[in-house]
């Protein structure tokens, strides 16, 4: 009986690894898998992110926020927010690179920001789709501890550990974290998503978000506006009426007017500011703390990056606390030092002082709200409900201003941190056909058109036009015998083309020479899809020659750059996979060594010396391999150790068999045979 038990306990265990497939390919829905069968239920939580998963058809909803991000998925008819590996329902939109070059995303990245400020990247969503020379970019450079540099294409990029990264690439790291959070919960690989953007994002910024999704291995099924997504979440329970969504988040502000009727969500108008949010509130408070310390101590902290990072975190914490208390203490010991010794910062901040510091920012929300109401053609009394979305709407002064603007107290019917992700998941359900009773009709936030004679901006599609939409207009040449026409595609609301944003340009060539404005008829067609992305084509009606352009941005990422970033994402993912792989295999190895040594101690005197030596050598080799990061070598040494220890069972089984037959003769064969057992795998 004992021998059979020993044989079962020493049964050779498998330490299997499945092949690693491409982790970040645009067409692939495969995720690297690693599942050690030896790890029991106790370690299942560790193994789960890298266990084999079937391909899932779910479309997850992701709110890629400036400060925090959130992911949700449909469960039946309702969206569910998914907790991340730290147990939180939102994830900080922070990416960091430590001294070893390892990538950290979310809470781990945020925790180490104080000691590693120059390599910790936060708020990079505000840089997405922006040029380095943009005044807003130049302003942001003065407020962040990391470097903002000029990319090879003229866009604003960031630098960490001596490497340059596109803000799109940083967004992809965060999207990857959201994707993995969903996969860990669902137990399936995910490659489809609906991602939200600020309603006032332009074409270049929307394209950058799609590129970020591609780098993260996601097929972005739809880009939808954040306030629209929040309204979807609010109205999914058959609520109807005219709704205003006031969305003040970490980096952007949007306001939208929607009409909800019989499951149809029709956006009437939208407006906003892509550079107004919680980051600006933090910066205002940060500047106050720096000036106060300089006034009292005579020391300027604005050049001390470590001190600034501590001040920034203290400012964010104070801002949050003042939403529920009338005052808070900011205490930062050893913030700096001079010849007289260490210096400490101790300031008591009242809510009224905070409101004074940020009042100019809150006031900036008034005009977009008024313009949105005007564009929607509705009056204040027509608005049935005002929804608050975004963490900054928890600030009492913001709620007070909203009440003043709309003449009614705002509703708190949605979670301001989660409503957008839930709405995105609902849109995913609509696209998949799981949710049939809801229909979303969104709008384009800004006018689109081309430059015509005299530098005039000629609109083809007005702002707040329901999308998808397609509009065309016929133009002619501006000079005699003109054989080529340059088409400049613009977005904005100003009358002069030069005052609006240039989205792209292309040439239509091969036009037959003719007097200006007489014969050539050139049809320009603007086609905006449901993502708000525009394709522009120009066609000479006489020759049927046609040229078109899908707007990316004046800079943007090329296909080669995206492919390169996909490969870099694979490398980062592989490093993370290896680290977790080693962690779990370490548990496996320790457990195996303990079991082998226990068996060897018990049966050492009953087996040949060469078997004992072989086992001891195998254990020694396995311990040595554990000190490396060579997974293949570790697996080989583990297999060798299991093979060596199995010889104990073989020798004991042989000895037990002979003894049993001899004993059986002495006992007259009266002993029942030892029962045989078959292991049942559950």
UniProtKB/Swiss-Prot annotation:
GO terms for molecular function: ATP binding; ATP hydrolysis activity; ATP-dependent protein folding chaperone; heat shock protein binding; protein folding chaperone; unfolded protein binding. Pfam families: HSP70. Residues 1-57 form a transit peptide. Its main location: mitochondrion. Residues 655-668 have a biased composition (Gly residues). The keyword Cell membrane does not apply. GO terms for biological process: chaperone cofactor-dependent protein refolding; iron-sulfur cluster assembly; protein refolding. This is Heat shock 70 kDa protein, mitochondrial. The lineage of its organism: Eukaryota, Viridiplantae, Streptophyta, Embryophyta, Tracheophyta. The gene is HSP68.
